[in-house]
């Protein structure tokens, strides 16, 4: 068993019963692969597949001019290097993007050529096509300086769908069937039955028309239409009746309208009897081929063909005419002996198409097309050309109609064709085939489709969404190019004169910047990032809307199994519309979700793993992952629980064809992080999964004692941690950098084998949380490829650590944990367990106004000296300054116009001169309620504006830091090269060298030490190999130096060039504050099982309930929060966490007692190897065992995987191991070791009942009271009503609503009520009067008329009622 460097340091004991047969795939693969498929940036043009950008270009090009003598052809495209890296884009507020250039060829044909067209001239050129945003390695985009995610969309797959209205449309409850052909791009074609069983069609949900109009428009005659939809009855006409060709099947179930006799005249079926199977057999046995029928049997039947008089050529009757006595007489006159009628019945062969044809008054193909034209373009006069163009453009033109490969595959599969490929447009056969199936459905044969089946919904990922936008932009370009191509020949234009890239840039910018699917990345913690990128939304353009989505779409469907998580979805209006991908799910080539299964052959489980889509899964019988397997790998139960076509069944093992790969394959990443999920109610699990995403990273992350084993995968895949790209030995570390000397076998020849990893330090995330990486390796450690070498936010030794392990006691305490309130020990706050750092970005811009430019300066009047002390000479705050609300961060003055001066201002003007009056102070100040430390300042200056001293100093510091960084890198690189050189040279024979070394002498270490290192290259080894290697290393060092010099120059150029700022902005200053948030009453906290609450009180440690040995609880929770919520998982977590801590304490005691290593190994083996997954501890050296034990002494981490976790017996065994009887007695534990006698900290008396105590991983959520607490005395007022604005963001007031007024009325508090409704709200004159009275020292309220009353009066006047106040 292989352990990575960090896994060895702390092994998580797993209780999994089943071996891991299939690793969890890379969690961000969906996003990265999709966008990579779109760009195909690493492939040479000739090897690119026809998808993504390539497909968009080839679908639009070549563009041909209107006269056909000029065309523009696409050859290839190339993506340039992005001008700025990700970090620079974030700082400057730019988009991380690459310039796209397309190589196009303009071909002009010779108009004068008498024969076929001859090429007159060709011009090739690379044309700029705009910028394409690039995806970062973690699957996000940097757009205008902020990280965004493009959420995948779950939409209805293109293809054909058959459904009915479930009897809701018509009062009789009759099922009305309909079909819809949905293309990827183009017009929708709907077919629908009405209550009278007439079949209609509509295009793009316009007015409905009889379907036979469409059939005529595609060139079918009424005869052909009837032939396609009906079978015919043949009749031979006689003078006094007729003879019907006998078809036995058609008679069964009919009521005989006459006696049926055999040749001898024996009655086989009497009149008015229902014909059954026996009757049919009798008739067949009698050898009857034709049956004589009376005249009235023909009446009312429908003719199948036109009947023409053979002599005159006159049409006697048309197809679809009803037979009447008159018509029969005419037929006999015309000597017609043979007729065919439609066979219909009321049960399973309705005459729907015939009835529809009767409604249709169009006569021929052209008339039908004109009718469609009038429906599509009402009011426009139809001409033959326009009618043809419109009809052919609807479904038959590849430019306007695209079914897509998915649509064609789904279409062909649904209508029963074998081949899954074909044209991307509709054919006449397609149109007809859908109508045939719809008629069959109405006749009672076949099944309608389930729209919510995941075989009918597909996922559109980033790549596909971006491709659609790019194509839309290209289409706009195409129109412009077509017009200009005509002039290309005359004006001698080049390709770049024809193509304007603006429409493309606009389409791309609009999509990434403001599309509903382009979302501001949730960056609270690593889990929220990863979940956001794995989200699948049914909303967005081309999707559903919240209001229209019904219950069925939102519900969990059997096909979600292993594809979409049934648990993780938001509460509220989006429930069920936004989902998360299941852990193992992936997309197939068509965009359908697939999940892996193990192949089972003859009840034997094989190692073959197949990914099945929802469509394929329906054909197989699939067993669950927890089915019992014997030692030979076969299913051992007599009956196995399995799924077939969405139903759970019990089957014999031989019938099973597949088996789940893992018990947790049903759920998403967030849900799979909840231990004992199987014991939680689904609603609470949903809250638990959602709340983990809101956990704020703590100052010191702590791994969960009870996890599920997937924490490491999440931390690594999220990109928060730093992984080694190649194996090697750690050469150097500091807080911001790790340097690894690469193993010889992994380093490439001639390359300098050093990898340098720069860590992210104290960076602001999108949610203002702090992102900070810290190294977890030491100098000299040997690491392998992909080992974790640095932890990020919310990770501990390469594992996700969202919260802290708290000692929890379930007991009431003086009402402080009533209704989910949480009582917390002061020790938790004192130890900074839940302290988090938040980084706030405050910015100020200096604009060029009409009255003159704003100025950032230290010279501000009326600013106190203690405020000025924090500002430097440029007026910008120092780094490291501790600031509180109202402190000035950046001094700024704005010119103001000449206004009427107040007497006070006149006085100031007289004293201080001009300056005081013509500018006003608009400095950047710390907002209310914020206290923090300035950690960074950035100054951006527009090109051409002189930089102030602070801006120049920031640039100089940055360059100096970069130069030191490069020098360090060079030192490390050279040191490594000289080490390799020394190894290679010692003992080699030389031909000569510095310090007059003799020819044939061997190089010694002393000789090399005596030489200056750069003179080593002057040594001339005798063998050519060494000489070449020496030369190669010399060149590689020179090359590296050259590269570093170039990099420094590039950096200097970037820093010294002006910044791109919005129009009118001269200068921008950004100040970053680090705010420390400690836990306080009002903060929201939660466990992982949906058990949320608000901190009600922080209690001194001496008052907390404690155990017999004096250990106080950290958190006291209300036991009543568990039973009704049915999230028992939290109690099981507490028991197992209690064991985890106890085992850690036992290991700590052993280490303190310095026991023999063998004894320590024995104890570790008892923990790890007696149940669940076993660990190979024998492969560990003694030093590694000691390091492992040292990391375990705070608690042994457990993994209890979802649906495959620890059972009661295992938990008890761990408790027995952790708390031997003598220790249990000291702690006052019960015999079962899962409860403890607690003592009141205030009185020292024991509580009446034993209490469940243990460790729970508890999280602090992002709903912090600091962000919500807000107070105001005076502030902004609404313009219309003059009432205070609402909300913290507007610095608003607290609404005193209707019910609050009732409360004051109930108490009779009339004065309070009066001031609430007048001076504290919208009595403008009253407000100013209160100020005046207060200044005079007179505390009297003069209430006047509230402004809202005036608004009411105005509103009534607007209705035309003259209302006025009677004034005394």
From Swiss-Prot:
GO MF, one example: ribonucleoside binding
Keywords assigned: DNA-directed RNA polymerase, Nucleotidyltransferase, Transcription, Transferase
Classification via Gene3D superfamilies: 2.40.50.100, 2.40.50.150, 3.90.1100.10, DNA-directed RNA polymerase, beta subunit, external 1 domain, DNA-directed RNA polymerase, subunit 2, domain 6, RNA polymerase alpha subunit dimerisation domain, RNA polymerase Rpb2, domain 2
Gene Ontology biological-process entries: DNA-templated transcription
Any one cellular-component term (Gene Ontology): DNA-directed RNA polymerase complex
Name listed for the protein in its UniProt record: DNA-directed RNA polymerase subunit beta
Function: DNA-dependent RNA polymerase catalyzes the transcription of DNA into RNA using the four ribonucleoside triphosphates as substrates.
Superkingdom, taxonomy of origin: Bacteria
EC number: 2.7.7.6
The reaction(s) this protein catalyses: RNA(n) + a ribonucleoside 5'-triphosphate = RNA(n+1) + diphosphate
Family: Belongs to the RNA polymerase beta chain family.
PROSITE patterns reported in the protein's UniProt record: RNA_POL_BETA
HAMAP family linked to this entry: RNApol_bact_RpoB (MF_01321)
InterPro entries found in the cross-reference section: DNA-dir_RNA_pol_bsu_ext_1_sf (IPR042107), DNA-dir_RNA_pol_bsu_external_1 (IPR019462), DNA-dir_RNA_pol_su2 (IPR015712), DNA-dir_RNAP_su2_dom (IPR007120), DNA-dir_RNAP_su2_hyb_sf (IPR037033), RNA_pol_bsu_bac (IPR010243), RNA_pol_bsu_CS (IPR007121), RNA_pol_bsu_protrusion (IPR007644)
Quaternary assembly: The RNAP catalytic core consists of 2 alpha, 1 beta, 1 beta' and 1 omega subunit. When a sigma factor is associated with the core the holoenzyme is formed, which can initiate transcription.
